[in-house]
């Protein structure tokens, strides 16, 4: 969902990715609050987000309110017709992913996985759509976008490495950044807001275990 063929205008894509940066409060909260408290907050938040996506295809009133605020940032495929199938938007997937990694991983890995996604995905989208020229074989994503993802994901991961008590070191941080970049570029059907942080977190966990 980074630098594939445009579905929304470039300016809207930039605004959409800026929201990802604002969502960095979620991984920061994982580090500050710890695993049990973060999960206790993020799991209900994910349930609420899914419920709102359900409501916008079942209730005309809910649909009007939600689309008045967020429609300019939604991709066409995220706007099903009233009465149609429930489709989760990018923000909902982000909430689901945050809850999932908060439950699955220690706080340092969970925070790094989500921060890498939020910063890396935005960088891949902006760089890939503006300067991406070299496409991966059989895919729509660009090598330039993937490189931007890996570099910025590693950079934000360093902030987690530096966080006292995070338990994350340079090697796992690099592994998570590279794994996330490659998984983001791969044409896998599962939404990248979920598959990327989970597989990135698994890569970091595996490196820490070595």
Residues covered by each model-derived region:
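Interhelical loop and helix-boundary elements at the membrane-water interface
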Residues: 1-40, 51-160, 167-210
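Aromatic-rich transmembrane-lumenal/periplasmic boundary elements in polytopic membrane proteins
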Residues: 44-47
């Amino acid at each position: 969902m980074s630098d594939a063929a445009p579905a929304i205008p470039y300016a809207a894509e930039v605004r959409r990715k800026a929201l990802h940066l604002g969502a960095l409060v979620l991984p920061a909260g994982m580090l500050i609050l710890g695993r049990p408290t973060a999960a206790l907050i993020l799991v209900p938040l994910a349930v609420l987000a899914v419920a709102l996506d359900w409501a916008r295809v079942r209730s005309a009133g809910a649909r009007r309110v939600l689309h008045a605020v967020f429609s300019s940032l939604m991709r066409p495929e995220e706007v099903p017709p009233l009465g149609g199938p429930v489709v989760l938007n990018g923000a909902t997937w982000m909430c689901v992913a945050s809850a999932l990694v908060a439950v699955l991983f220690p706080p340092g890995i969970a925070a790094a996985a989500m921060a890498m996604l939020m910063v890396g995905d935005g960088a891949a989208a902006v760089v890939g759509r503006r300067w991406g020229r070299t496409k991966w074989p059989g895919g729509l994503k660009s090598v330039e976008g993937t490189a931007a993802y890996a570099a910025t994901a590693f950079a934000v991961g360093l902030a987690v490495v530096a966080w006292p008590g995070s338990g994350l070191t340079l090697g796992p941080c690099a592994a998570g950044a590279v794994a996330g970049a490659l998984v983001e570029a791969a044409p896998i059907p599962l939404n990248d807001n979920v598959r990327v942080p989970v597989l990135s977190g698994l890569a970091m966990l595996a490196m820490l275990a070595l």
